[in-house]
Curated annotation (Swiss-Prot):
Keyword field contains Isomerase: yes
Gene3D superfamilies: Alkaline Phosphatase, subunit A, BPG-independent phosphoglycerate mutase, domain B
Location of the active site: S65
UniProt-annotated binding residues for Mn(2+) 2: D15, S65, D444, H445
Organism of origin: Syntrophotalea carbinolica (strain DSM 2380 / NBRC 103641 / GraBd1) (Pelobacter carbinolicus)
Full protein name: 2,3-bisphosphoglycerate-independent phosphoglycerate mutase
Length: 514
């Protein structure tokens, strides 16, 4: 039987919506979500692997938004930068990297300092400590005499007060290698902003360049003082280590940013490298011997990168475009890069026939537990307007709330976030069905389905749980969905659209005829 091709086909991504059989401290379970529950009861659904090897990460590694959207858009399991870089260390090719060797040689020649900055974490979302250790060892081999480490504290992808342990591990490792010192300790809230909150970035920048902030004799003392003041890792106010002689960024120094994820690396990189920077007034602009990004943060930067991006032919967006179909990407600021840049394989450029809608995320609150609805109602309004236009064949929509509010660790707020998203999903489903379309509702990784750890403390990180997928299509009521992985979503969408799957897509459609 020939199935009618419905349009639009909507991919609705509930960011951070995972499956957890335990209801306690589970915002998904605790929330009153009548529309999502009805969808799960009435329409075909299955489970999707969104972590570890299923998305090209190491075994057991939790998924994240960048990895999730990259896998979804590629229609294949994508070998992630974390795995790629770690493998190069194992194989010793890391220590022959051209750009890393070059900046270290420049520092030796200028008799400057080498600054290594990034997220001190083994969370594997933005960085990994093993990469930092390899850089210090490489600097030792290269003859670099001074290595200064600017340690950005995590607390989102790791427990909120795990930073003290990570700093202790780092200090032990530096002792073993015989090179390097911690120069600054800064919460990621300040150093890794991605929403143009330049007042935050300025505090981190001034700590690194001018030594502005409280001085401590050791990294252990710095983090202990932060905890004593009620600051968890993410929010540790910039402080420098070394007493009278802070290890600041000066003329002739070199810098390596060891984060491999792009979105939260752009602003601080722009602050150090842009000649026409306007985010704030820089009191000091060091003339650097070199600046190397571990991966490509933004193609427009034109900066050296140790691991250039890999290309992925025949992405979902490209295949839809070549078929002459129109597509839309829509999200609020916090997830806009994910439905555009990451979904398109790390490319900023839209495909022909691809439109984009950006709804600003709230700026009037410091953390989203204070506004758990975020901009979801406005995103929904914009979505419904575009559905009504009848222009689009494929719409990719992201609701940020379950992830961004989940990261705060405030369970009541995460429950409110899920209830907001439930109402918004209901409006979207009604509009798409009324327009003659169909939907796949899913997530990129888990988060808010676990809001406390085993000890009952707030859980602010992603999870390695599977995520749901629901097919809402009145013409396919007899279809069953099989369990799969994120890479299977693109082939499924193409089948719903009546477009042949390209050879480069190794994912398989989730549709199983009954």
């Amino acid at each position: 039987m020939t199935v009618e091709i419905r349009r639009p086909v909507a991919l609705v991504i509930l960011d951070g919506w995972g499956i957890n059989p335990v209801c306690e401290h589970n915002a998904v379970c605790q929330a009153d979500t009548p529309r999502l529950r009805a969808l799960l009861e009435s329409w075909p659904h299955a489970r999707i692997g969104a972590s570890g090897r299923d998305v090209g990460l190491p075994d057991g590694q939790m998924g994240n938004s960048e990895v999730g959207h990259l896998n979804i858009g590629a229609g294949r399991t994508v070998y992630q930068d974390l795995t790629r870089i770690s493998l190069s260390i194992e194989e010793d090719t890391f220590f022959e990297n051209t750009e890393l060797r070059k900046v270290m040689q420049q520092v030796v020649e200028s008799q400057g300092k080498l600054h290594l900055m990034g997220l001190l974490s083994d969370g594997g979302v933005h960085s990994h400590m093993e990469h930092l250790y390899a850089l210090v060892e490489m600097a030792r081999r290269a003859g670099v005499e001074q290595v200064c480490i600017h340690a950005f504290m995590d607390g989102r992808d790791t427990p909120p007060q795990s930073g003290a342990g990570y700093l202790a591990q780092l200090e032990d490792k530096l002792q073993d290698i015989g090179l390097g010192r911690v120069a600054t300790v800064i919460g990621r809230y300040w150093a890794m902003d991605r929403d143009n909150r330049w007042e935050r970035v300025e505090k981190a920048y001034r700590a690194m360049t001018e030594g502005v902030g409280t001085s401590f004799e050791s990294s252990a003392a710095a983090i202990a003082d932060a905890y004593a003041q009620g600051q968890t890792d993410e929010f540790v106010e910039p402080r420098f280590v070394g007493g009278e002689k802070p290890c600041t960024v000066d003329d002739g120094d070199g810098m390596i940013f060891f984060n491999f994820r792009a979105d939260r690396a752009r602003e601080i990189t722009r602050t150090f490298t842009s000649s026409d920077f306007s985010g704030f007034s820089r009191e000091k602009t060091p003339r650097l011997a070199g600046y190397v990004c571990l991966t490509e943060y933004d193609a427009s930067f034109g900066l050296p990168m140790a691991f250039p991006p890999e290309t992925y032919p025949e992405l979902l967006g490209e295949v839809v475009s070549r078929a002459g179909r129109k597509q839309l990407r829509i999200a609020e600021t916090e997830k806009y890069a994910h439905v555009t840049f990451f979904f398109n394989g790390g490319s900023e450029e839209p495909f022909d026939g691809e439109d984009r809608v950006l709804i600003p995320s709230p700026k009037e609150v410091a953390t989203y537990d204070l506004k758990p609805e975020m901009s979801a109602p406005a995103v929904t309004d914009a979505m419904l307007e575009r559905v009504a236009s009848g222009r689009y064949d494929l719409i990719v929509l992201n609701f940020a709330n379950p992830d961004m509010v989940g990261h705060t660790g405030v369970e009541s707020a995460a429950i409110a976030a899920m209830e907001t998203v439930d109402a918004c999903v209901g409006r979207v489903v009604d509009a798409v069905l009324n327009a003659g379309g169909s939907l796949l509702i899913t997530a990129d990784h888990g988060n808010c389905e676990q809001m406390a750890d085993a000890k009952g403390a707030p859980h602010t990180a992603h999870t390695s749980n599977p995520v749901p997928v629901i097919l809402v299509d009145p013409d396919r009521t007899g279809v069953k969905l099989r369990n799969g992985i994120l890479a299977d979503l693109a082939p499924t969408l193409l089948e719903l659209m009546g477009i042949d799957k390209p050879a480069a897509m190794t994912g398989r459609s989730l549709l199983e005829p009954s």
